[in-house]
């Protein structure tokens, strides 16, 4: 799979590798959040996660209806939740969590350096320095990861935990520890 990445990026369009990557992870991941850009493919990914290798312990397959392959703070996100071989579906409305934004352009990324700086800014300033869209996307998706990891019993509590970790500076401290460990 490592050799397919550069070719996939060079193609510039989604390919079968976008679907196979999360399913063929050699680490045997049992808990994960998987974003799918094409809504029609999401049930297939969820079904495969439910069946592969005994099935995912807990996974969320997500599709933001604005065309995002992640949980979107703009409009509804469709969710396929996989637990112990079973798939259930639900809709996630960011307004329910006070994290809805109206302008999708506010989520637009840049080059890797700009994107990294944006994340660092979000982690360094719990108020997000005016980047409400970035903070909403971060909390919605981090909340899903915390929930799927089994740290909290509900998605709502996952968002609350993510918010607390960002607000206290613990998220930034964890990033700094990771960098030191990696020698970066």
Question: Which residues fall in each region the model found?
Answer:
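Glycine-rich anion-binding loops and their surrounding alpha/beta cores
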Residues: 1-184
């Amino acid at each position: 799979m490592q050799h397919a990445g550069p070719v996939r990026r060079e193609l510039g369009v989604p390919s079968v590798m976008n679907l196979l990557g999360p399913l063929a992870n050699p680490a045997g991941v049992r808990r994960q959040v998987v974003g799918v850009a094409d809504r029609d493919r999401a049930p297939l990914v969820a079904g495969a996660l439910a069946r592969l290798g005994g099935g995912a312990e807990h996974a969320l397959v997500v599709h933001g209806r604005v065309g995002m392959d992640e949980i979107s703070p703009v409009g509804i996100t469709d969710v396929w939740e996989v637990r112990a071989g079973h798939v259930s579906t639900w809709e996630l409305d960011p307004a329910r969590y006070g994290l809805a934004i109206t302008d999708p352009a506010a989520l637009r990324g840049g080059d890797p350096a700009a994107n990294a700086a944006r994340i660092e800014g979000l982690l360094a300033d719990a108020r997000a320095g005016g980047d409400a869209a970035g903070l909403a996307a971060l909390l919605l998706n981090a909340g899903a990861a915390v929930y799927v990891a089994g740290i909290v019993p509900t998605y709502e509590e996952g968002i609350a935990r993510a918010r607390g970790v960002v607000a206290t500076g613990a998220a930034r401290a964890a990033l700094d520890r990771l960098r030191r460990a990696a020698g970066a």
